[in-house]
């Protein structure tokens, strides 16, 4: 059964959504919060599978809260709001879904079913990753309702966002339940940004930008950000002294 946290500044809205989730028979509401700050605390404490998050809240909005979460450990996020003008931004920020108030029970059921499907696939991939050796020649990924085994030597980069960790090869991109930390430890990929790893042999060009930042262009033309803290190490690995 999925575990869920409901964050909304209106008590009635929290109670109503909790009741609708309970009626699905597939979700256990483990807590709620009346604002984003308290919600962040409860996310870290309760570690729910999914957060149903209002957007328009005082002081800190739901979208701002989303930006505070660690992409590697954060739960799935479903925005619940009366304002449809936020829909595009929500999906750009990689929210799992977007529900309009008043929440339609049938629409909510569809969201819950999708969540169950995605989380079940994630659990299967985690079982595969649990038996991986100290070094990975292949990376188990999920793509289009199938498990994809991606050869590590073909991987250009790996990156994380709110929807998970993604592995990009010379021919495809797929999602994996392995964390960036695991990929960094068990593959030749090196850290170039908090949310990106890159294969040194895939680098075609490094553009030096302002403020000590940089951007990698891979041999297939993919652009990867490089943060200041990793640029020096990256240069050293490439034999560049300045």
Swiss-Prot record:
One of its GO terms (cellular component) is cytosol. The modification 4-aspartylphosphate is found at residue 54. Coiled coil: none annotated. One of its GO terms (molecular function) is transcription cis-regulatory region binding. InterPro entries: CheY-like_superfamily, LytTR_DNA-bd_dom, Sig_transdc_resp-reg_receiver, WalR-like. Residues 3-116 form the Response regulatory domain. One of its GO terms (biological process) is regulation of DNA-templated transcription. The keyword DNA-binding applies. PROSITE patterns: HTH_LYTTR (PS50930), RESPONSE_REGULATORY (PS50110). Residues 139-240 form the HTH LytTR-type domain. It comes from the Bacteria. It holds the Pfam family LytTR. Keywords: DNA-binding, Phosphoprotein, Transcription, Transcription regulation, Two-component regulatory system. This is Uncharacterized response regulatory protein VP0538. It comes from Vibrio parahaemolyticus serotype O3:K6 (strain RIMD 2210633).
